[in-house]
Amino acid sequence: MSVLLIPNRGKDAGLSVTRHTAALLRRQGISVLMPDEFAGDFTSRDGITFLSLDRAVGVAEQVLTIGGDGTLLRAGIFCAEHDRPVLGINLGRTGFLATCEVAELDTKLARLAAGDYTLTTRSLLEAIVPSRNWRAIAMNDVVLFGRTRIHPMDYKLICDGTFVSRYRSDGLIAATPTGSTAYSFSAGGPVLDASAPVMVLTPVCAHSVHAVPVVFGADRHITIVAEQENRDTVYACADSGPQCELAPGESLHITTSPKKLRLITFDPAEQLSAIESKLIRR
């Protein structure tokens, strides 16, 4: 069995947790791989094999991210592309996705080695702006916003070719069930069951008392049009990644991606219990 470690230098000072994790995995008889950019931080005594990220994820059977939810988010799309399950070791604040705490490493890595875990499947969104030849995959959300983010813009929402509503708001968020606990939640959107085959569209600071979040089935094709009334450019981004401009009249198309992300979990009820412990009591 082989595991790829993807650490976040900004979260793991001196890569101490990464080094400890590698030692625990090797003690369980698991081969440890890491991207070759980290080769200079270790010695041959650490027993780690360094490869390019593409080669490493092709060889590894599982991926462990070491950082926080953001670290897992950035690695998640890459892992989904290669159909590799992921476990997040949490060094961040929330740990809603990265559910393994450092204090639990001994126990949970032993369970990982023994195959005592389950895999949960998370849906992804695919966003396309045809007029710009732009395509992105999102694990959390696809967000539309104006240049300054504080001035309202006008959007038209269409589902499967049928007009649904118009929004005048600072932005619009299309979120997966996973992303429903992130930006969409902060904007007043509902928390969705992670296994539900749905997506939610949530307006940000809408200039209407009637503008509410709308939940769509995962098989729907959502089109959002930057209205001609807009005097400025609208921007789209997926999971806070590279942005795409939309001039007035241009459209963003959102569907559920055929690719899925598999998360390693040791408790199938983790997401439900985290609502209380990490969202409400935080």
Task: Please describe what each predicted stretch is.
Residues 10, 69-71, 94, 178-180:
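Short glycine-rich anion-binding loops that position phosphate/pyrophosphate groups of nucleotides
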Residues 31, 83-85:
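Proline-centered loop/turn at the N-terminus of a beta-strand
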Residues 1-62, 103-118, 129-136:
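ATP/NTP phosphate-donor binding region
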Residues 61, 65-69, 76-78:
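N-terminal glycine-rich "phosphate-gripper" loop used for MgATP/nucleotide binding
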Residues 152, 162, 166-210:
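Gly/Ser/Thr-rich active-site loops/lids in small-molecule metabolic enzymes
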Residues 131, 136, 144, 149, ...:
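ATP/nucleoside-binding phosphotransfer catalytic cores, i.e., glycine-rich phosphate-binding loops
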Residues 14-15, 70-75, 181-186:
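Short glycine/serine/threonine-rich phosphate/pyrophosphate-binding segments
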Residues 93-170:
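Catalytic core of DAGKc-family lipid kinases
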